[in-house]
Amino acid sequence: MPDIGVAPHRAPSIESRESWTAACLTLAILSISYGSPLLVVVGLKPIQEALGTDRSVIALAGALVWVGTGLGGILMGWLADRIGIRFTASIGAVMMALGLAVSSTGSVWALYVGHGLLIGLLGNGAIYAPLVVYVTRWFDRRRGSALALISSGQYIAGIVWPSVFERGITLYGWQTTMLAYAAVVLAVILPLTLLCLRPSPEPLAAHAMSGDPRKGATVLGMNANLVLALICIAAFFCCIPMAVPNGHLVAFCSDLGIAPTHGAAMLSVLLACAFLSRQFWGMLADRVGGLRAVMVGSACQAVAITGFLLTQNEIGLFAVSAAFGLGFSGIIPSYVVAIRELFPSSEAAWRVPTFFFLGMSGMAFGSWLAGMLYDHFGFYAPAFAVGVFFNVANLAVIGFLVARQSSNNAKVLTTATA
């Protein structure tokens, strides 16, 4: 049985101007849709006060968005292969707007149903993972750069939406802000999905031209599903520390006496730095491979999150937030590059969303765990410390996979030159 060790010789590229048009349209859609989990982050304390409950209860709503998005990506990825990305993404936009409307009604259960089921499972679940798979099918040589571009939608959203949400919540309240954002989702995403998205190249044609790994091959000398399981476990571990500052930075700053506007600005700085460095990480993944790029990014994230334990002044936290953004931004796209390098294109519709489900479950668990630890201890240091622990666990798993890949490549090279 063949083994996937080194990348095969690539035939003429499938990439074209249409490939980058598809990537730019996806970037625009994700720049809007990625705002949905940020509204609860920015409005964590006002929503908590309005509903009269614990912080972990509200943080769970944000966590449910990630779990729903991950699980929905598997279901909607399967559906997108059958009815087309245009229709699944349009369904996602409508469900996201409906979820925001339900969440704004002012009860904890409405918040959970709106965020977990409608915004997460049926909303972002129909948009994020299916669009990522859609874009990977337009590229074979610069897939890492393309994924870096579209994933920057998260950081464009992070630059724009926190300040908009903070001002909207201050002036009009969190419920009105949710409804206004729902209107923006419908007004922008629906026309883009219905009128502009075009079918990707046929999977079999892309497979033949790009030298995809063959179905049934072992991966890194192991069963293919075992390798995917290890990648998913690593993703779960690395997304736990990723979620702590992403989900609690504004509330963390408020607890330290830093103005909410400055906390929202700090989150924007974090995501702006992530946006600026994202293309570097994409080029690195194209050059050294997805797994090695993941390991470098995860090591940078571990160093940066440790900084949140070492400083509590505003200037220092701005610097640490910037460093964290620069470090973590390339990790998730590099995982996708690794999966597309190691597995056939025909399996991308379920392998990539499965990875996203575990990664987003890690984001959900990390966001909820940070809120729970805060409720128990009354401050955020334990949450950041636990984040460092899981980051080290991630590095152990990824280090094992990189070692297997290096060993496998050496064996293939020795066989080829014998």
Language-model-detected regions and their locations in the chain:
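Helix-loop-helix hairpin linking two adjacent transmembrane segments in secondary transporters
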Residues: 141, 149-201
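Conserved MFS/SLC helix-loop-helix module at the cytosolic interface between two early adjacent transmembrane helices
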Residues: 71-109, 285-288
